[in-house]
Amino acid sequence: MMSLRIYYGGTFDPVHLGHLAIARAARDELQVAVRMLPAADPPHRAVPGATADQRFTMLSLAIGDEPGLLLDHRELDRAIRFPGRPSYTVDTLRELRGELGPSRPLAWLVGADSLLGLTRWHEWEALFGLAHFVVAERPGSPLQASVDGELGRALEGRWADNEQALFASPAGRILRLHHPLREESASAVRAQIAAGGPWRALLPPAVADYVAAHGLYRSPTP
Protein backbone atom coordinates (compact mmCIF):
# COMPACT_ATOMS: atom_id res chain seq x y z
CA MET A 1 0.00 0.00 0.00
CA MET A 2 1.51 3.32 -1.08
CA SER A 3 1.71 6.35 1.19
CA LEU A 4 -0.86 9.11 0.82
CA ARG A 5 0.02 12.72 -0.04
CA ILE A 6 -2.45 15.41 1.16
CA TYR A 7 -2.62 19.04 0.03
CA TYR A 8 -4.79 21.79 1.50
CA GLY A 9 -5.25 24.63 -0.96
CA GLY A 10 -6.84 28.00 -0.33
CA THR A 11 -6.32 31.74 -0.34
CA PHE A 12 -5.77 31.78 3.45
CA ASP A 13 -6.68 35.48 3.48
CA PRO A 14 -5.92 35.48 6.36
CA VAL A 15 -5.11 32.01 7.68
CA HIS A 16 -7.19 31.54 10.84
CA LEU A 17 -7.65 28.95 13.58
CA GLY A 18 -10.38 27.19 11.60
CA HIS A 19 -7.93 26.53 8.75
CA LEU A 20 -5.41 25.07 11.18
CA ALA A 21 -8.08 22.93 12.84
CA ILE A 22 -8.95 21.34 9.48
CA ALA A 23 -5.29 20.68 8.65
CA ARG A 24 -4.63 19.17 12.08
CA ALA A 25 -7.74 17.00 11.91
CA ALA A 26 -6.66 15.54 8.56
CA ARG A 27 -3.09 15.05 9.80
CA ASP A 28 -4.21 13.31 12.98
CA GLU A 29 -6.95 11.13 11.47
CA LEU A 30 -4.91 9.99 8.48
CA GLN A 31 -1.51 10.04 10.20
CA VAL A 32 0.18 11.80 7.30
CA ALA A 33 1.61 15.29 6.83
CA VAL A 34 -0.65 17.97 5.36
CA ARG A 35 0.89 20.37 2.86
CA MET A 36 -0.80 23.77 2.92
CA LEU A 37 -0.78 25.41 -0.48
CA PRO A 38 -1.69 29.12 -0.82
CA ALA A 39 -3.44 30.01 -4.06
CA ALA A 40 -2.30 32.83 -6.30
CA ASP A 41 -5.49 34.46 -7.59
CA PRO A 42 -8.35 31.93 -7.65
CA PRO A 43 -10.65 32.63 -10.62
CA HIS A 44 -13.81 31.67 -8.68
CA ARG A 45 -13.21 34.13 -5.83
CA ALA A 46 -12.76 37.88 -5.43
CA VAL A 47 -9.22 39.24 -5.41
CA PRO A 48 -7.68 38.57 -1.98
CA GLY A 49 -7.28 41.40 0.51
CA ALA A 50 -3.59 40.71 1.16
CA THR A 51 -0.86 40.22 -1.40
CA ALA A 52 0.35 36.73 -2.27
CA ASP A 53 3.63 37.38 -0.42
CA GLN A 54 1.75 38.55 2.67
CA ARG A 55 -0.55 35.52 2.64
CA PHE A 56 2.44 33.22 2.24
CA THR A 57 4.21 34.91 5.16
CA MET A 58 1.13 34.63 7.38
CA LEU A 59 0.77 30.95 6.56
CA SER A 60 4.44 30.37 7.32
CA LEU A 61 4.01 32.13 10.68
CA ALA A 62 0.90 30.06 11.45
CA ILE A 63 2.58 26.74 10.71
CA GLY A 64 5.89 27.57 12.36
CA ASP A 65 7.73 24.34 13.09
CA GLU A 66 4.60 22.33 13.96
CA PRO A 67 5.13 18.66 13.07
CA GLY A 68 3.04 17.34 10.20
CA LEU A 69 2.14 20.73 8.71
CA LEU A 70 4.16 21.82 5.69
CA LEU A 71 4.07 24.72 3.25
CA ASP A 72 4.00 24.41 -0.55
CA HIS A 73 4.39 27.52 -2.71
CA ARG A 74 4.03 26.03 -6.20
CA GLU A 75 0.92 28.06 -7.15
CA LEU A 76 2.60 31.33 -6.18
CA ASP A 77 5.70 30.32 -8.14
CA ARG A 78 3.54 29.49 -11.15
CA ALA A 79 1.89 32.92 -10.97
CA ILE A 80 5.34 34.53 -11.17
CA ARG A 81 6.34 32.38 -14.15
CA PHE A 82 3.03 32.94 -15.94
CA PRO A 83 1.68 36.34 -14.86
CA GLY A 84 -2.01 36.83 -15.56
CA ARG A 85 -2.77 33.13 -15.86
CA PRO A 86 -5.65 32.04 -13.57
CA SER A 87 -4.85 29.72 -10.67
CA TYR A 88 -6.83 26.52 -11.22
CA THR A 89 -6.82 23.58 -8.82
CA VAL A 90 -6.98 21.16 -11.74
CA ASP A 91 -3.64 22.50 -13.04
CA THR A 92 -2.04 22.05 -9.63
CA LEU A 93 -3.34 18.49 -9.33
CA ARG A 94 -2.10 17.64 -12.81
CA GLU A 95 1.32 18.98 -11.88
CA LEU A 96 1.32 16.94 -8.67
CA ARG A 97 0.12 13.83 -10.46
CA GLY A 98 2.97 14.24 -12.94
CA GLU A 99 5.45 14.39 -10.06
CA LEU A 100 3.98 11.55 -8.01
CA GLY A 101 3.12 9.20 -10.87
CA PRO A 102 -0.21 7.55 -11.71
CA SER A 103 -0.37 5.14 -8.75
CA ARG A 104 0.48 7.27 -5.70
CA PRO A 105 -2.59 8.15 -3.59
CA LEU A 106 -3.17 11.91 -3.66
CA ALA A 107 -5.84 13.87 -1.75
CA TRP A 108 -7.13 17.45 -1.79
CA LEU A 109 -8.40 18.75 1.55
CA VAL A 110 -11.41 21.10 1.51
CA GLY A 111 -14.17 22.45 3.70
CA ALA A 112 -17.76 21.39 3.06
CA ASP A 113 -18.66 24.68 1.36
CA SER A 114 -15.91 24.18 -1.20
CA LEU A 115 -17.09 20.68 -2.07
CA LEU A 116 -20.70 21.85 -2.40
CA GLY A 117 -19.53 24.52 -4.85
CA LEU A 118 -17.36 22.13 -6.85
CA THR A 119 -19.37 22.43 -10.07
CA ARG A 120 -18.14 26.04 -10.35
CA TRP A 121 -14.50 24.92 -10.46
CA HIS A 122 -12.63 24.79 -13.75
CA GLU A 123 -12.81 21.27 -15.28
CA TRP A 124 -14.35 20.05 -12.05
CA GLU A 125 -15.24 16.60 -13.33
CA ALA A 126 -11.57 15.94 -14.13
CA LEU A 127 -10.61 16.40 -10.48
CA PHE A 128 -11.88 12.96 -9.44
CA GLY A 129 -9.44 11.27 -11.81
CA LEU A 130 -6.54 13.17 -10.26
CA ALA A 131 -7.12 13.04 -6.50
CA HIS A 132 -9.27 11.99 -3.58
CA PHE A 133 -11.14 14.62 -1.57
CA VAL A 134 -10.95 14.87 2.21
CA VAL A 135 -13.79 17.06 3.50
CA ALA A 136 -14.50 18.80 6.80
CA GLU A 137 -18.25 18.97 7.45
CA ARG A 138 -20.08 21.78 9.23
CA PRO A 139 -21.52 20.94 12.69
CA GLY A 140 -25.09 19.64 12.46
CA SER A 141 -25.09 19.64 8.66
CA PRO A 142 -24.36 16.16 7.24
CA LEU A 143 -22.56 16.69 3.97
CA GLN A 144 -23.91 13.72 2.04
CA ALA A 145 -27.50 14.82 2.70
CA SER A 146 -26.73 18.29 1.29
CA VAL A 147 -25.51 17.07 -2.10
CA ASP A 148 -27.96 16.71 -4.97
CA GLY A 149 -28.35 17.44 -8.67
CA GLU A 150 -25.34 17.27 -10.97
CA LEU A 151 -22.84 17.16 -8.10
CA GLY A 152 -24.80 14.46 -6.29
CA ARG A 153 -24.69 12.26 -9.37
CA ALA A 154 -20.95 12.85 -9.76
CA LEU A 155 -20.28 11.91 -6.12
CA GLU A 156 -22.45 8.79 -6.11
CA GLY A 157 -20.38 5.75 -5.20
CA ARG A 158 -17.35 7.83 -4.21
CA TRP A 159 -18.01 8.17 -0.46
CA ALA A 160 -15.41 6.31 1.61
CA ASP A 161 -16.35 4.63 4.91
CA ASN A 162 -12.82 4.89 6.31
CA GLU A 163 -9.39 6.26 5.52
CA GLN A 164 -8.09 2.96 4.17
CA ALA A 165 -10.03 3.57 0.96
CA LEU A 166 -7.76 6.55 0.26
CA PHE A 167 -4.61 4.48 0.63
CA ALA A 168 -5.96 1.69 -1.58
CA SER A 169 -6.37 3.72 -4.78
CA PRO A 170 -4.75 6.83 -6.31
CA ALA A 171 -7.85 9.04 -6.69
CA GLY A 172 -11.62 9.33 -6.86
CA ARG A 173 -12.88 8.75 -3.30
CA ILE A 174 -14.34 11.22 -0.77
CA LEU A 175 -13.65 10.94 2.96
CA ARG A 176 -15.43 13.00 5.61
CA LEU A 177 -13.33 14.02 8.60
CA HIS A 178 -14.64 13.13 12.04
CA HIS A 179 -13.71 16.61 13.29
CA PRO A 180 -16.30 19.14 12.04
CA LEU A 181 -15.51 22.60 10.70
CA ARG A 182 -15.13 25.42 13.17
CA GLU A 183 -17.20 28.55 12.73
CA GLU A 184 -14.38 30.91 11.71
CA SER A 185 -14.25 32.16 8.13
CA ALA A 186 -11.69 34.41 6.48
CA SER A 187 -14.41 36.77 5.25
CA ALA A 188 -15.77 37.14 8.80
CA VAL A 189 -12.27 37.84 10.12
CA ARG A 190 -11.71 40.51 7.48
CA ALA A 191 -15.09 42.07 8.29
CA GLN A 192 -14.31 42.13 12.01
CA ILE A 193 -10.97 43.85 11.40
CA ALA A 194 -12.52 46.39 9.02
CA ALA A 195 -15.28 47.16 11.54
CA GLY A 196 -12.86 47.53 14.43
CA GLY A 197 -14.41 44.58 16.27
CA PRO A 198 -12.63 41.85 18.25
CA TRP A 199 -10.63 39.62 15.93
CA ARG A 200 -7.31 38.62 17.48
CA ALA A 201 -8.70 35.48 19.11
CA LEU A 202 -9.65 34.14 15.65
CA LEU A 203 -6.04 34.06 14.41
CA PRO A 204 -2.82 32.39 15.52
CA PRO A 205 -0.97 34.93 17.71
CA ALA A 206 1.93 35.40 15.28
CA VAL A 207 -0.51 36.02 12.42
CA ALA A 208 -2.52 38.50 14.50
CA ASP A 209 0.67 40.41 15.25
CA TYR A 210 1.57 40.47 11.55
CA VAL A 211 -1.89 41.71 10.53
CA ALA A 212 -1.73 44.49 13.11
CA ALA A 213 1.83 45.49 12.23
CA HIS A 214 1.01 45.78 8.51
CA GLY A 215 -2.44 47.33 8.91
CA LEU A 216 -4.08 44.60 6.84
CA TYR A 217 -7.84 44.47 6.17
CA ARG A 218 -8.59 47.82 7.77
CA SER A 219 -11.25 50.06 6.26
CA PRO A 220 -9.77 52.95 4.24
CA THR A 221 -9.58 56.19 6.18
CA PRO A 222 -11.97 58.77 4.68
UniProtKB/Swiss-Prot annotation:
One of its GO terms (molecular function) is nicotinate-nucleotide adenylyltransferase activity. It holds the Pfam family CTP_transf_like. It comes from the Bacteria. GO terms for biological process: NAD biosynthetic process. It catalyses: nicotinate beta-D-ribonucleotide + ATP + H(+) = deamido-NAD(+) + diphosphate. Pathway: Cofactor biosynthesis; NAD(+) biosynthesis; deamido-NAD(+) from nicotinate D-ribonucleotide: step 1/1. The keyword Endoplasmic reticulum does not apply. It is an enzyme of class 2 (transferase). Keywords: ATP-binding, NAD, Nucleotide-binding, Nucleotidyltransferase, Pyridine nucleotide biosynthesis, Transferase. CDD domains: NMNAT. Its EC number is 2.7.7.18. NCBIfam families: cyt_tran_rel, nicotinate (nicotinamide) nucleotide adenylyltransferase, PRK00071.1-1. Belongs to the NadD family. PANTHER family: BIFUNCTIONAL NMN ADENYLYLTRANSFERASE_NUDIX HYDROLASE, PHOSPHOPANTETHEINE ADENYLYLTRANSFERASE. Catalyzes the reversible adenylation of nicotinate mononucleotide (NaMN) to nicotinic acid adenine dinucleotide (NaAD). This is Probable nicotinate-nucleotide adenylyltransferase. It comes from Stenotrophomonas maltophilia (strain K279a).
